[in-house]
């Protein structure tokens, strides 16, 4: 009986997270043939290259203090890790943005496609990613797996809808990047509800 209860506690959250990821991936697969028609291979290539920065640095933007949030033993420790995660995430986002900006500025092909606005968008994307890392870890600490899964699906759906929209009006690479940026903000309010409470009562 105890083993059954323990298994259900493990499998339940695992199913919720896996289901959310599976739904998001399915949506991306379904939309993919359309996006390849709306954007040139060059647009998609440059977009992927720019977003590589998120794939590489995204998981470590918070100095792994976001992972410590999940293992917090008490409220004071939780608040300390939340603050550290947010501050380090903000600072490291700026640091990475400056370094990557130098690379982009010296790449004429990319600059012709995206323009100077990328120097504004890139730091915002990284800061939003750092914030999401912190919020997701807080939701994980609270065992709010349904919210994590739901937000992941909502972001994926919104991004794909916006990608199609900007593709139809031929915004190219900058449209793809803007759709990525905008989608990050979907669900942040829901995820941040408990963050406000924790920081208010610190």
Describe these PLM feature segments.
Residues 8-63, 88, 97, 101, ...:
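Signature of the first transmembrane helix
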